[in-house]
Structure formats: C-alpha cells, structure tokens
Amino acid sequence: MDTSNAAGNSSNDQIEVFFDGLCQPYNPGGIACYAFIIKKQQEDPQTIHSEYGLAAEPFTDYATNNVAEYTGIIKALEWLLLQQTSELNNNHTATESIIIKGDSQLVIYQIKGRYKVKAIKIIPLYQKVMSLISKFNDIHFEWIPREKNSEADKLTNYAYTKIIDSDPTLRKKIGQHMATEQQLEFLKNLGISPEKYLSKIEAKRLISKIKKYRHNI
C-alpha cells in the first residue's frame, strides 16, 4: 500500500478515480450526495465505470459534505476491489496502479496522514477507507483543484437533482433555501446556467467568486 502522490507515474496500466461529495442546500444537515468516476489511463482515457447516490439520510446530523466525500471514496474502492477479486479468480494478475483524485484537501490529507481525523462521525469512514486501501498493492491519493474535478462535480450535482426530482417532500423542504430570483438573474445575465436546485449559499459563493475575478482583471 502506498498513499503518496503518483506524480511521474506514466504507466499505461494506471487507473484514475475522481470522486466528489456535496451537501446541499446547507451543510451540515442537508442532502448529502456522492459520485465517482473511474478511468483507464491511456492515450485516450476511457471511463470504465461511474456511480452516484445518497451518502446519508437527508436532513440528519450525519448528512455532511465530508461524509459524502468519504462515501465516494469507499464506494469507488469497493468497486475496484470487486474487479480485482474477479481478475484474480480468473487467473489474471491485478497489476494496475491506482490513483485517487479529489478536490477536498481535508479528506485527501487525512488519508495521507497529514491531518488528524477529529470528527466522531468521520472516524469509522476513515477506518473503512484505510482498511480498503490496505488490500491494494499500488494505490495513491492526490489532491486536485476543483476545476480539475469537474466531471465528478457534475455527477454529484446530477445525483442531487435526481434525488430531489424523485421526492416531492424533499422539494418542499428545500424550497426556502433555494437561490433568490435576484441571484439567478445575476448569474443568467453573465451567461451562466444555474443548477436546477441551486441554493442561496452556493449562489452567493458563485457570485462572490465572479465579482472577485472581475475585480482582478
């Protein structure tokens, strides 16, 4: 097991995993969703599997962004372990180097041992991750900026939208937390198409980021 960065590893057998998690319309205690995408690293990288879902019971203390991030890693590792077991059972050698990439610096650095895990609800998830990665021979973790994790980010937002679409009770409960007409109009005037269930908090973050960017140019 190796949880260091895999920088410089150009092996054609490398597997890349991009994971993400969110908790909206507020964190903690909102609707926590996870997603992950697994790619085979080659000249033209191919997605070999992707998955998304609910990370915790909505509107509970357990529903947090970090729970969702950890759930994404756990689900990805469980899928990879299943594939590895299948290969070994078919007398194939599981030789791929695996690199797990995410934009949560906290989660990545906890797994790499740079940060301590202090939150009670995260400890069992962290222990589960460490147990799973011990089953792989060549596995690495790398923090990436949010803009380089756009596919996984879009998939978590898709999961969030799909879950709310399927449950009228959830739609009713989040109503007061949705972005205001003024916020939506501001974003649309900039050519930005807001997510279907964009929260006030997320809209405020986006607008602040845009204003800061425009001020600096």
Each model region followed by its residue ranges:
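A short glycine-/small-residue-rich loop at the edge of a beta-strand within enzyme catalytic domains
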Residues: 63, 67, 120, 143, ...
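Glycine- and charge-rich intrinsically disordered segments
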Residues: 1-11, 87-91, 162-165
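RNase H-like nuclease fold core
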Residues: 2-67, 71, 78-79
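Interfaces that engage single-stranded nucleic acids at replication/repair/recombination sites
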Residues: 162, 166-217
